[in-house]
Amino acid sequence: MGCSVVGNCKSVMLMSRMSWSKLALLISVAMAAAMTDSPPTLICMGILVSVVLNWIVCAVCEEASELILGVSLETTRPSPARVIGEPVFDPRYGYVAPAIYDGKSFDVILPISALSSASTRKETVEMAVENSRLQPLESSQTPKSLVALYSQDLLSGWGSRIKGPDGQEYLLTALHVWETNISHLCKDGKKVPISGCPIVASSADSDLDFVLVSVPKNAWSVLGVGVARLELLKRRTVVTVYGGLDSKTTYCATGVAELENPFRIVTKVTTTGGWSGSPLYHKDAIVGLHLGARPSAGVNRACNVAMAFRVVRKFVTVENSELYPDQSSGPARELDAETYTERLEQGIAFTEYNISGITVKTSDREWTTAEALRVARYKPLGGGKAWGDSDDEDTQETAIRPLNLPAGGLPTGQSALGQLIEYAGYVWRDEGIINSNGMPFRSAGKSSCRFREAVCRAVHRDVRAAETEFPELKELAWPSRGSKAEIGSLLFQAGRFERVEAPANLQLAITNLQAQYPRSRPRSCFRREPWCREDFVAEIEKIAHSGEINLKASPGVPLAEIGVSNQQVIDVAWPLVCEAVVERLHALASVDPRQHDWSPEELVKRGLCDPVRLFVKQEPHSRQKIEQGRFRLISSVSLVDQLVERMLFGPQNTTEIALWHSNPSKPGMGLSKASQVALLWEDLARKHQTHPGAMADISGFDWSVQDWELWADVSMRIELGSFPALMAKAAISRFYCLMNATFQLTNGELLTQELPGLMKSGSYCTSSSNSRIRCLMAELIGSPWCIAMGDDSVEGWVDDAPRKYSALGHLCKEYEACPVLPNGDLKEVSFCSHLISKGRAELETWPKCLFRYLSGPHDVESLEMELSSSRRWGQIVRYLRRIGRVSGNDGEERSSNESPATTKTQGSAAAWGPPQEAWPVDGASLSTFEPSSSGWFHLEGW
């Protein structure tokens, strides 16, 4: 109640201050106006009077605000000398003890009465530490986030201001300090009352002893208290602790802080009475909370409070997401259920803490929670061995049982993959084929992992209003959403699929195309066989925390049962995700699903892959597509499968992105800089001189990709990436799963494709594989050159190309010669939704960008990034200024291709990662890959 009243008073005060200031200004202006008949000097005097009057009003309001908030001056009182250590016997004086006064340390002689109590006391509150001296400070030298805490007129301890993820500011201090009935915050000699503020989180355990209190912003702002960052302590760290007799008479001491266990810190920093609750500062961040002393060990105690919040995960923001660079050797490894049981059997003792209702168990080096103990982990069957310890012979399929896997390659019992299947709650039932033409789909059952059935968005009123200025907007609208739209569009796209046999010249085309791509080197964890589990875990964690994963995206099926985003799943279930990736990579390398001809349903049942979640992409569609029900579908693979693909194919994809200018695939291409446009244009112009160019448009590319095209792609990946044997097997099995997928709709309905093929648009490999497959298609029909970005391409002209593409199973709806100048040189090309010419790349799909911008509260900078190169940009900016969406210099016209950021094109986001070293491999060939009668490839030695 007290906090609420203070907050309301503060709001009234601010409004009052603003009104009086404006009134004073108006009076002064009126005075100046009245003097208009006088010389200009009198007008200047009137303005000066207005400034002074305004300053007086502001000062009065400031004092009034402090009065309303109950701000008072801190009472300073002399402090007695404090005994800060155990008494020792000195033959000359008797018993003496170290003491401190006014920041100086000295010994005092103890009387017999004091000796009696001091000698029987087990623990002092604070402790002086050798080589850690108190340094007197001016109050301005203390951290802005530090505050003194008073119980009426008595200094009880210290605290700090930290910020939570919800934007709320909290007071962090020791619980035993807060329990002294803290009534005031104090900073620089000013006190403000805070009684009645609620506790948000706390722990009464003596090793933790912290409390988090919700304090209104008004109390912080009137004292000028800043906000500190909270970070996890990293091993042995130099820290500084602050305290004093009051908020103006302050000291600091510096020393080393170390972890005793993941939550308990010991410091060699001198403190004195009344310093409890003071933060441990490392540079400008808080890395711990001072609690008291442990004189028997000659150290002070502190809490690794950031670790406590890392476990709770909801109250405050911890800046450093990784506790140690190498957590495998650091003293803060989180345990799974089985390892925890093993530790108990080994006689390792665990201390139990309670943090806001969450039970934490910790040893000196490891910790877990009661929640985690309910999550079972992989446990080898009796008599078996871990797959990382297998030898070369064990990698064959006959060795599955000794590797603790049943026939089919799925770890059972307490495996991570088994848990994923359990979370999904699959109910399999064959309800027959649901369509009669194209790619057949079978209704296979349902899962318990459901998603929200969203409704179609209405066109925003700002879009409607802009249609008179930009008639092109009339042709756009938002697509339908939900399972009904998904199944309708799926059947429409599937109906156009036509399966064809691999052409006779496929192997020659593969050989010719492969020579145009760079080679790469596998991740180090794959290069050593048999595989080492610890190496895999380290590499997977590196990928997950490198920024490669879109943390806002859905984790897919079945991990959406745990969290709605990748970030949430990684936060609460990372051990499960990481273990599932390790197990899946092993399972993929342990079997050849082609030999069993496993169906999409069986692949999911055996843990080799997860269902592909199908949903309609929320982007503006043409009204023609909406009327046809031909929505753009995203086939989103699960977080686990994405990590599997990144592990296998990341180095090759990264190499191709870094070297986009020297290979046919262009996912790494950017068009935001003139140098990038020039590089692309020079390549196209040179190729055009050797053979005239053509622009082709393949309709529904993802839904027409053939299985033999995917096999060709993975064969080139294996060769170019120098995949070792186990890695090659895992890659082949992953592509088998990719081309034989189980789809899941929003309502949980499961559909299986009955023929192999189709590119999954949400796969990590989509952009890279589509680009290579598109270039392969051009090679197959005899085109002398080709560049491709996904399904977009520019290639050397081929007579009768649409018919030849049709023979490969692809519908080429447009095939046009590139425009040329009178002298025959290339004039321009349409590529990746851009009209590209010498020195210019102009986005052609500007209506979609403007439609999106007008549909919500977007920044003009994001629009400028996409449209600054458009010929319509000037008209767009003028219109936006007219309706008030842009002001000042926002959206100023720039010269061609000087947009502030990269033009958004397929795969361009990945282009800005650090380039990976290309790894030369000599003497490689594709002779081990030959198409069988079914058109599939076989790896020699299987």
UniProtKB/Swiss-Prot annotation:
GO terms for biological process: DNA-templated transcription; proteolysis; viral RNA genome replication; viral translational frameshifting. Disulfide bonds: none annotated. The modification Phosphoserine is found at residue 390. GO terms for molecular function: nucleotide binding; RNA binding; RNA-directed RNA polymerase activity; serine-type endopeptidase activity. The record marks 130-131, 319-320, 397-398 as: Cleavage. It catalyses: RNA(n) + a ribonucleoside 5'-triphosphate = RNA(n+1) + diphosphate. It comes from the Viruses. Its EC number is 3.4.21.-, 2.7.7.48. The polyprotein is proteolytically cleaved into several chains by the viral protease. InterPro entries: DNA/RNA_pol_sf (IPR043502), Peptidase_S1_PA (IPR009003), Peptidase_S1_PA_chymotrypsin (IPR043504), Peptidase_S39B_luteovirus (IPR000382), RNA-dir_pol_luteovirus (IPR001795), RNA-dir_pol_PSvirus (IPR007094). Residues 888-917 are annotated as: Disordered. GO terms for cellular component: host cell membrane; membrane. Residues 897-908 have a biased composition (Polar residues). Residues 129-326 form the Peptidase S39 domain. This is Replicase polyprotein P2AB. The lineage of its organism: Viruses, Riboviria, Orthornavirae, Pisuviricota, Pisoniviricetes.
